[in-house]
Amino acid sequence: MLDATPQGLVGARETLLLEMARYQPDERRPVSDLTALVRIYLLSRIDVMWWRDAPAYRTDEQVGGSADLVDLEWLRRRDLLRFRYQEQPTTLLGRGARALRRRVRPSVAPHTSGLLFRRARREMVALLNDVGREFTAHAPPGAPPLWVTSLVRSAEHQHRLRQLGYAAWLPSGHCLGWAADVEMAWFDRFGARDTLAELLLARQRAGEVNVVDEGQAWHLCLAPESRGRLRRVYEAEMAV
């Protein structure tokens, strides 16, 4: 598998060794130990093997200006999304208000920084809408909708995350626009985590997505074979 990635076997192996060398345990991070780091890294290479010919979004500006991405807020305001998300606060006041809300009302939203870019590929919107509908139909009463914690990122932003100590690898399915992270741990309080896990794993078994258990959130990457079908689904749903 590693030989089929853009870095090749040697490059992927060297990257993994470097990541192991720089690893620092931190209970706030999804990578709990070196074993988890190796597992998550290797499974995430499936993404870049699948999409090895796809160009990455190198800068924040490219993400903001890409015609391949749609504005989630525009869709949300028209009730066209079947999942929730929140944007990253851009000010100190906003971050403080977010932290206070988490303490006072922990059931309102998961403990996540939110999306830097409220943009996504049309096919990813269709996938997440489909998962969201299925989850709502099978989750216990009172469980909130599917919650998306990460979507498209630029390589520029990925480097910023690395500087903060996160396991943000390059290349990445997020930088190609074909990956998303969905909240898992928060749904324990509603008795819905196992339901969501089984729905995601069923899609993995069907070959629709790659799924990586990262602890608090699970990482999803769309399989290339599903792209055409989900593009048609999006166009039908949005009456394009």
What kind of region is each of these model predictions?
Residues 1-128, 213-215, 223-240:
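Extracytoplasmic cell-surface/polysaccharide-interacting catalytic and binding patches
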Residues 115-116, 132-136, 165-169:
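Short secondary-structure capping micro-motifs at structural edges
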Residues 155-170:
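Charged, often glycine-rich, active-site loop that binds/positions anionic groups
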